[in-house]
């Protein structure tokens, strides 16, 4: 198994409902380590930059509006096969299709208000981590 890093967002809907601690508990219980974390409130320019791959798509304006609607928690997770393990812990994007016991099955309100985001590949993880964290803010443990 390979030690790798992934990127995670606790979205505005989950932050507003005070789910940060519960989600962190699940992350750590799954054997992943949080090696960087901070709370940010994205502005329109930051949201556009982070979600640039979706620019021009029908859902892009609503996605930006949601992701700038309140603070988010961004974090870097590390562990064996962290990307796949965190994606399994999150559950499917559509909470109605997410397996019981996953974060989205338990906390998501809808497809958009689905509580969390996680990188889907090593390339995405590297890009997303670098967007929010200089290497000096990451503390492997």
UniProtKB/Swiss-Prot annotation:
Primary location: cytoplasm
GO cellular component: a single term: cytoplasm
Compartments, as annotated in UniProt: Cytoplasm
Gene3D superfamilies membership: Nucleoside diphosphate kinase-like domain (3.30.70.141)
InterPro entries per the UniProt record, alphabetical: NDK-like_dom, NDK-like_dom_sf, Nucleoside_diP_kinase, Nucleoside_diP_kinase_AS
Binding site for ATP: 11, 59, 87, 93, 104, 114
Domain of life of the organism encoding this protein: Bacteria
EC number: 2.7.4.6
Cofactor: Mg(2+)
Reactions accelerated catalytically: a 2'-deoxyribonucleoside 5'-diphosphate + ATP = a 2'-deoxyribonucleoside 5'-triphosphate + ADP; a ribonucleoside 5'-diphosphate + ATP = a ribonucleoside 5'-triphosphate + ADP
SUPFAM superfamilies found in the cross-reference section: Nucleoside diphosphate kinase, NDK
Keywords, alphabetical: ATP-binding, Cytoplasm, Kinase, Magnesium, Metal-binding, Nucleotide metabolism, Nucleotide-binding, Phosphoprotein, Transferase
GO MF annotation: an example: metal ion binding
Active site: residue positions: 117 (pros-phosphohistidine intermediate)
GO biological process, one term: CTP biosynthetic process
Keyword Mitochondrion tagged: no
Cross-referenced Pfam families: NDK
Function: Major role in the synthesis of nucleoside triphosphates other than ATP. The ATP gamma phosphate is transferred to the NDP beta phosphate via a ping-pong mechanism, using a phosphorylated active-site intermediate.
Entries under PANTHER family matching the protein: NUCLEOSIDE DIPHOSPHATE KINASE, NUCLEOSIDE DIPHOSPHATE KINASE DDB_G0292928-RELATED
Oligomer and partners: Homotetramer.
Family as reported in the entry's similarity comment: Belongs to the NDK family.
Name of the protein in question: Nucleoside diphosphate kinase
Upper classification of the organism: Bacteria, Pseudomonadati, Pseudomonadota, Gammaproteobacteria, Vibrionales
């Amino acid at each position: 198994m390979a030690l790798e890093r992934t990127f995670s967002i606790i979205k505005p809907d989950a932050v507003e409902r005070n789910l940060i601690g519960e989600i962190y508990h699940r992350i750590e219980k799954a054997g992943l380590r949080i090696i960087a974390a901070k709370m940010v409130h994205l502005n329109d320019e930051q949201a556009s930059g982070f979600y640039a791959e979706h620019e021009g798509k029908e859902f892009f304006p609503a996605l930006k509006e949601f992701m700038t609607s309140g603070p988010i928690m961004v974090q870097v997770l590390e562990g064996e096969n962290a990307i796949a393990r965190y994606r399994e812990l999150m559950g499917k994007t559509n909470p109605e299709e997410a397996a019981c016991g996953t974060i989205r099955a338990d906390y998501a309100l809808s497809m958009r208000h689905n509580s969390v985001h996680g990188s889907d590949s090593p390339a995405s993880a590297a890009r997303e981590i670098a967007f929010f964290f200089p290497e000096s803010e990451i503390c492997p443990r």
